[in-house]
Amino acid sequence: FNAVEGNTTFYARPAPATVARWAQVMPEHFRFTAKFPRDISHEGDLRDQLEPAFDFTRLMAPLGRRVAPYWLQLQASFGPARLAELDQFLQQIGVPVAVEVRHPAFFAKGEEERALNRLLHACGVERVCLDPRALFSCTSRDPAVLHAQAKKPKVPPRPAAFSQHPQVRFIGHPQLEANEPFLTPWVEKVGAWIEEGRSPYIFLHTSDNRLSAALAQRFHQRLMQRLPGLAALPELPRAPEVEQLGLL
């Protein structure tokens, strides 16, 4: 795989030595979508968080272009009345950013959602598309499933391509075959984006992420059928989770 969601930075800033180690082991082509820490995205006016945000981007600077884009995940209480804050933050931050929103008004197909999309499009900023439908179709009482359903917002997918790099988070069903009908529209959408010359970022999860790699391989195999000539994924190492834990 050639990209990973940087969820760890949402909860805690890495030490400079950790960032230096990441810079040593990450290939130049690898992409790390580092999330702004939650004290930046979830506490107070975004305009007041610009200096901490600059500090964070300076911390991550040793990774260079491998951090692209940064993700700004906004809480569900961040609504249309605060778009002016978001606009100023995006105008001044100075690094590639993608934004994930969770307020219901931004999924209502009304003027408030259109205003958000206009703002992001004007800034060349992607709207992160979360698709949790497969997860919420699951009726299992497994604790991992229930935990994931409690954490993820039940929002409709909003595919967007405001730049060369559309961003998709697909939260899957724990039974791989149950994801097929939910993956089908994404195979077509992602295939069309690639044909347009875009390079989408597609992140696939399962409730406990043990099958995430298998789900990603399944999706890529279908994408290869949609796009003849698309290169196959390299074979996974036997214990990828151990390597990733060492990285993070």
Question: What residue ranges belong to the model's regions?
Answer:
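Residues lining hydrophobic/aromatic ligand-binding pockets adjacent to catalytic sites
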Residues: 1-248
